[in-house]
């Protein structure tokens, strides 16, 4: 009975996500009717139908909104997945993908390249620079946190916060001293957004989220044990430090990939796992797929709000998620 209910929940969430993805494509400064969106998708994917819509509508839907929607779904899924496993290995309900210092490293890399190097490889310049910065930040955090060959999760989180503050201070100083026209572009990226979405940029985040999901599902049993406490994990014959290190590495690499394209989008990794646990409990083989679907669903609709609330301007999506996340946790605390 429980397995049937879980399967029905996955089917319902999957169907809701699919419908949401299609419907969301109609929203924006230029509204496109849902029936036109549907016909454009059928024509571009399967070759069905004869194009009887405006060329501008096809350009907006297929080249701008579909990549943006897919990137939003991938980023939402990835951040929710990372948040769930970090909360498990740290046993901290407030653990978040950005606590590892990866986001600040990505920000610093982006600031340095945009202000002092320029677009040496076109549109890919900012994502590549951000990913390199994220990797360097991750390595610095791991080097500082590693003491006598041992990696403690509390020490790692503290090092992540410390490195994050230092790197953000350097990035803000460079922005203050740099060209203000270039700084404005970096500032919008720092606030989080999906404006960099292009078809050619989707393969890497898609691969990282899919591979991360497969690897973390394979670690569901150790994650369950760590949630129950380190003594339980040791009793079951697990090496808790090794499990934590693997999770931190996977989470850091995934965060680096996602943040390099979308900028800093907060609260998804904090909020979605709490909602998912209320639906299916804390068993990670059941929890992680639900987190992926809920994270995608959440960010797809937040992006709709971001591009319609102050149209024709784009509201930075990180601002929207922060506002929603703050209200969510106020409600959560009042309910306890």
Language model segments and positions:
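Alpha-helical transmembrane segments in inner-membrane proteins
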Residues: 1-336
């Amino acid at each position: 009975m429980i397995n049937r209910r879980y399967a029905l929940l996955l089917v319902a969430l999957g169907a809701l996500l699919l419908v949401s993805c299609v419907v969301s494509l109609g929203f924006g400064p230029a509204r496109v009717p849902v029936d036109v969106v549907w016909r454009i998708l059928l024509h571009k994917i399967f070759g069905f139908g004869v194009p009887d819509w405006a060329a501008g509508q096809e350009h907006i839907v297929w080249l701008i909104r579909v990549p943006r929607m897919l990137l939003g779904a991938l980023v939402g899924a990835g951040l929710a997945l990372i948040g769930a496993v970090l909360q498990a290995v740290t046993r901290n309900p407030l653990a978040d993908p950005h606590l590892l210092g990866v986001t600040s490293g990505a920000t610093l890399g982006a600031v340095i390249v945009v202000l002092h190097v320029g677009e040496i490889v076109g549109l890919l310049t900012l994502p590549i620079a951000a990913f390199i910065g994220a990797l360097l930040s991750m390595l610095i955090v791991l080097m500082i946190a590693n003491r006598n060959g041992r990696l403690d999760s509390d020490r790692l989180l503290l090092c992540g916060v410390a490195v994050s503050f230092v790197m953000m201070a350097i990035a803000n100083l460079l922005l203050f001293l740099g060209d203000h026209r270039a700084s404005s572009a970096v500032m919008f990226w720092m606030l989080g957004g999906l404006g960099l979405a292009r078809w050619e940029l989707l393969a890497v985040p898609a691969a990282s989220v899919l591979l991360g999901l497969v690897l973390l599902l394979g670690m569901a049993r150790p994650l369950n044990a760590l949630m129950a406490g380190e003594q339980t994990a040791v009793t079951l014959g697990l090496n808790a430090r090794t499990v934590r290190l693997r999770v931190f590495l996977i989470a850091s690499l995934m965060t680096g990939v996602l943040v390099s394209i979308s900028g800093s989008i907060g609260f998804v990794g904090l909020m979605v796992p709490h909602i998912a646990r209320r639906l299916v409990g804390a068993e990670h083989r059941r929890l992680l797929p639900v987190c992926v679907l809920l994270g995608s669903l959440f960010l797809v609709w937040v992006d709709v709000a971001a591009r319609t609330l102050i149209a024709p301007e784009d509201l930075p999506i990180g601002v929207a998620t922060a506002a929603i996340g703050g209200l969510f946790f106020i409600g959560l605390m009042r309910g306890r």
